[in-house]
Amino acid sequence: MAKKVVAVIKLALDAGKANPAPPVGPALGQHGVNIMMFCKEYNARTQDKAGYVIPVEISVFEDRSFTFITKTPPASVLITKAAKIQKGSGESAKGSVGSISRAQLEEIAKTKLPDLNCTSIESAMRIIEGTARNMGVSISD
């Protein structure tokens, strides 16, 4: 018989840098999860993605055991790295803060495809292009 899931916790953590300090400690501690075990497993699984923020979905079971799934980095993080900017524009309608090429857009779409609600690269590219436009990043051909 399958274990009963008590809670699902969603966090966005720096790859390879999870530690028991907030936000990890309080989020897991209230469900009785072994925080250090989670930190070690998460850091081991994400050490090759250093520099990115990796979302994680932790399922906590009634016997206090857990499993977790790592997702792909947020599109906004991938776009800022590709455009070599610190952050998106606060007023995207007024002007562009950077630009990315179609090839970079396609690469980001391929990376994000497993987490997006679509099946083709073209539709994934349109989703990422919309995110870039809202950040004030233009797409150059």
Swiss-Prot record:
Judging by the UniProt lineage, the source's domain of life is Bacteria
One Pfam annotation reads Ribosomal_L11_N
Asked whether the UniProt record includes Cytoplasm among its keywords, one would answer no
Q: Give one GO term, molecular function aspect.
A: structural constituent of ribosome
Record keywords: Methylation, Ribonucleoprotein, Ribosomal protein, RNA-binding, rRNA-binding
PTM note says: One or more lysine residues are methylated.
GO biological-process terms attached to the record: translation
Q: What does this protein do?
A: Forms part of the ribosomal stalk which helps the ribosome interact with GTP-bound translation factors.
Its subunit composition reads: Part of the ribosomal stalk of the 50S ribosomal subunit. Interacts with L10 and the large rRNA to form the base of the stalk. L10 forms an elongated spine to which L12 dimers bind in a sequential fashion forming a multimeric L10(L12)X complex.
What family does the database annotate?
Belongs to the universal ribosomal protein uL11 family.
UniProt name for this protein:
Large ribosomal subunit protein uL11
- Give the organism the record lists: Synechococcus sp. (strain CC9605)
Lineage of the organism: Bacteria, Bacillati, Cyanobacteriota, Cyanophyceae, Synechococcales
